[in-house]
């Protein structure tokens, strides 16, 4: 009789304290032994020789648009794409599904879809808007991992921005609930006026868009949100931080004891404004991609541990919504399949960024911050979530490689070094050699209180 359900043998295992060659034994979906050599047999044995075994990534920021906007993306296609990139879990945003996740009814509607269709594990953000302050308690009871708010227009009329009163009262409530708030930080008045002025003068190109959302709009708003968090005691996460100066504000606040973190997104590390001019609307996002000097500074902040985690901000749409003048088209980038490969290429190979830190940025920290118990690292008692990686395999991303509903991404045609050959969720292989090999087995993740 097999002693274990699964043994991974001979892998280079990316543990929290370093990379070491080891075997990993799994029973009942959990890691039960990590040793240089594990004797005996198992129901399944995987030879990971020559591979690096990473903890499966958790993407803290995706828009899978389900239910209600399934012509853009679905939980089925989005979670499959995530698995193909080494992903085992995601936290889905309260928009751009329709209706938005602003109360228990719509939370449960989304949960029902995920229970049926999600290949990987999932958590859900609740929304905080000026219209649903009375719904925060019921969303907390549903098990949201936190709340998301926009300081500027969200792009979705049914998800109104958080004004200052909502910020104050909402953060006071969330502090009592013990749940974090993530804020999209851009100054509403400045972005609105600059955008309207640009459109009135028929300035609708790439650089016009950048000029309408300059760095100060993020920097100023990050400073203000930190002040609200400091006064209320609410845990704050700055979403998709794009400027090094804003990262510095977060680091300074943390140094004085404020419970604040920031996430960044791959495109702020890999792309510059020049790339956006070349790529066009497929690379439009908000906040916009910045210049090369800021990008270099962002890498410095990553090396200095001032950025807590890296997500994809996967925000697809119907490709028709990307047709037209840059200023007017939908802003959002499809990227959840390439987060780990991007970091292996641009961080590890190009900049000698440690593999352990990549695992922290994509798996460990996000689960710790959101209090997801037993997930995010290769350690005893944790979920047996693994991404098997060939560090030196080079490939050019093709549209047909993508599992998204629409085979669109600014990274199509890019050369990557470091590929995912197999993804394992709680001991079950869900992706292998370019194919999804499992039925949906995702489970709902709730914060551990």
Swiss-Prot record:
Q: Which GO terms describe its molecular function?
A: allantoinase activity; cobalt ion binding; zinc ion binding
The record's GO CC annotations read:
cytoplasm
Positions contributing to Zn(2+) 2 binding: 148, 184, 240
Q: Name one GO biological process term.
A: purine nucleobase catabolic process
- Catalytic EC class: hydrolase
Q: Name one Pfam family in it.
A: Amidohydro_1
Q: Entry's CDD domains?
A: L-HYD_ALN (cd01315)
Q: How is it modified after translation?
A: Carboxylation allows a single lysine to coordinate two zinc ions.
Note the SUPFAM superfamilies from the entry.
Answer: Composite domain of metallo-dependent hydrolases, Metallo-dependent hydrolases
As cofactor, the record names:
Zn(2+)
Ordered alphabetically, the record's keywords are: Hydrolase, Metal-binding, Purine metabolism, Zinc
> Would you identify the family this protein belongs to, as annotated?
Belongs to the metallo-dependent hydrolases superfamily. Allantoinase family.
Summary of the function given for this chain in its UniProt record: Catalyzes the conversion of allantoin (5-ureidohydantoin) to allantoic acid by hydrolytic cleavage of the five-member hydantoin ring.
**How does this polypeptide assemble, per the annotation?**
Homotetramer.
Q: Which HAMAP family match?
A: Hydantoinase
The name on file for this protein is Allantoinase
Starting at the broadest rank, the lineage of the source organism is:
Bacteria, Bacillati, Bacillota, Clostridia, Eubacteriales
